[in-house]
């Protein structure tokens, strides 16, 4: 049995927040707000809603900070609050996951045989590619985008995604595979 050891570099700020020190709250907000906003955007794909969810998440986190036991980092704990708030916002929109049977995607998988590892990308090329993918993700149906984001960017497994979204693990896996396939189609079809 191994014990996981981690260093919580913001433990002092968390303790100050538990004592009600607003300056510490501001420091934690400054440190985490940009990353947490990105999480919100990946899930919600709407700036106004992402900003609202971010603020609500920080308010909840600071209100419940006395319950934080530092069994994980503050960032992990906060991210869980942010993801839950964003998912709840999606539910409030009453958006349903895409019925995958309504889409005909053709073949089973993309052929990656034409990928050439010798191709190298400059930083500019890489930024361009990242931007293309970001734009393509915005075009995905909401259900696809949410599952893809939770799996790839937030690190949830399909069982956890199923529990969060109220779908089966199999549906999560299928949504993920279809989302990847659709994303590739969108990216291949983009002309910039």
Could you say what each language-model-derived stretch is?
Residues 131-146, 150-171:
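Helix-turn-helix DNA-binding module
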Residues 38, 52-59, 72-84:
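Structural recognition of an alpha-helix C-terminal capping motif at a helix-to-coil junction
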Residues 66-69, 80-101, 126:
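Arg/Lys-rich amphipathic alpha helix in sigma70-family domain 2
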Residues 2-3, 18-27, 37-56, 169, ...:
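Short, charged helix-capping/linker segments at alpha-helix termini
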Residues 18-19, 45, 55-73, 92-94:
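Sigma70-family region 2
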Residues 1-7, 16, 98-101, 132, ...:
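C-terminal edge and immediately downstream basic/flexible tail or linker adjoining helix-turn-helix-like DNA-binding
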Residues 91-94, 140, 145, 175, ...:
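Short, Lys/Arg-enriched C-terminal cap helix and immediately downstream tail that follows
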Residues 6-7, 96-123:
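Internal acidic/polar
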């Amino acid at each position: 049995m191994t014990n996981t050891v981690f260093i919580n570099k913001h433990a002092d700020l968390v303790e100050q927040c538990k004592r009600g020190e607003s300056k510490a709250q501001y420091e934690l907000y400054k440190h985490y707000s940009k990353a947490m906003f990105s999480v919100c955007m990946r899930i919600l794909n709407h700036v106004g809603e992402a900003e609202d969810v971010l603020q609500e998440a920080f308010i909840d986190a600071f209100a419940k900070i006395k319950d934080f036991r530092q069994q994980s980092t503050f960032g992990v704990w906060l991210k869980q609050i942010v993801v839950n708030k964003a998912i709840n916002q999606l539910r409030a929109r009453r958006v349903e996951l895409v019925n995958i049977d309504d889409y005909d995607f053709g073949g089973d998988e993309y052929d990656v045989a034409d990928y050439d590892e010798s191709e190298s990308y400059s930083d500019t090329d890489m930024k361009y590619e990242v931007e293309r993918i970001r734009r393509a993700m915005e075009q995905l149906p909401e259900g696809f985008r949410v599952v893809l984001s939770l799996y790839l960017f937030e690190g949830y497994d399909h069982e956890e995604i199923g529990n969060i979204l109220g779908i089966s693990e199999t549906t999560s896996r299928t949504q993920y595979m279809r989302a990847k396939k659709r994303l590739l189609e969108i990216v291949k079809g983009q002309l910039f």
